A protein has these predicted regions:
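Short, Lys/Arg-enriched N-terminal segment that forms or immediately precedes the first helix
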Residues: 1-10
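A short alpha-helical element within helix-turn-helix/winged-helix DNA-binding domains
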Residues: 32-41
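A short, conserved structural fragment
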Residues: 58-68
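Short, cationic-aromatic polyanion-contact patches
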Residues: 12, 66-89
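Pre-recognition alpha-helix immediately N-terminal to the DNA-recognition helix
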Residues: 17-24
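Helix-turn-helix DNA-binding helix
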Residues: 18, 49-50
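Short helix-capping/hinge SLiMs at alpha-helix to coil transitions
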Residues: 24-30
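Alpha-helical DNA-recognition elements
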Residues: 24, 55-56
């Protein structure tokens, strides 16, 4: 017996901005953005603010990264599709 899939609310406008920044950075530079660069771009006072956005995006399978490794934050296919308007998010 499978449990019913719980539908998540849409991502917040700020989460969409962070996702877009990650995707644009990767497309423009050919390598992944760092947590510090996200903090600087969004003027987050604490690195924890970026981490909270990243974790929320990862729970929705919109970004991925390798913990403990530098420059591994990237959008997933689902994240790219959401930004292209092919998904509700």
């Amino acid at each position: 017996m499978t449990s019913p899939q719980v539908e998540q609310p849409p991502i917040t406008p700020r989460q969409r901005e962070v996702l877009g920044f990650i995707a644009r950075f990767y497309a423009d530079h050919g390598y992944a953005v760092t947590n510090r660069q996200i903090c600087k771009a969004f003027k987050f006072a604490s690195p924890n603010a970026a981490v909270m956005h990243l974790k929320a995006l990862r729970r929705r399978d919109l970004v991925t990264w390798q913990p403990g490794e530098a420059r591994t934050i990237r959008p997933t296919q689902a994240g790219v599709e959401l930004l292209e308007g092919n998904s509700d998010g």
